[in-house]
């Protein structure tokens, strides 16, 4: 019952009702399917899921429980290549739904370029650049993700 985790469906008096297991299983399967994930067992323990499956489960839960904004802070860190692609595909599917804003925080230029429609680049808490993906070329993104002008300053300093 990973999907409901603290928000279980209960029928009967508050605190004394019965969990609606079949209904929770149905909803879990349905909601995961909406973002393209087919699960064999909605009761699979979280500990047996891959990192990508865990991230996808968290995203599906947020959508089901009414999130208007998903803030994804390095959602692919500590994942293998296959799991990274699984999570990125899920993010793209959510993006196509069109009713949820996604804030992706990443240090991975490739992932940013695959997902972003607009960028804001920070360095030490300061905005060093921003723009739409249609306005920024690959070199702009690379330069800003590596620290913008500050990286040039560092290069000069290291040459001294």
Please annotate each region the language model reported:
Residues 1-160:
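Glycine-rich phosphate-binding loops of nucleotide-dependent enzymes
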């Amino acid at each position: 019952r990973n999907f409901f985790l603290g928000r279980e469906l209960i029928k009967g008096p508050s605190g004394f009702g019965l969990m609606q297991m079949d209904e929770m299983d149905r909803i879990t399967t349905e909601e995961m399917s909406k973002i393209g994930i087919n699960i064999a067992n909605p009761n699979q323990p979280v500990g047996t899921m891959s990192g990508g499956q865990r991230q996808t489960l968290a995203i599906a839960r947020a959508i089901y429980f009414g999130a208007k904004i998903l803030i994804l802070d390095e959602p692919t860190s500590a994942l293998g290549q296959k799991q990274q692609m699984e999570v990125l595909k899920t993010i793209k599917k959510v993006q196509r739904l069109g009713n949820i804003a996604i804030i992706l925080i990443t240090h991975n230029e490739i992932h940013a370029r695959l997902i972003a429609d607009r960028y804001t680049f920070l360095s030490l808490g300061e905005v060093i650049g921003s723009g739409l993906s249609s306005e920024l070329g690959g070199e702009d993104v690379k330069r800003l993700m590596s620290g913008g002008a500050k990286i040039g300053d560092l290069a000069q300093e290291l040459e001294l």
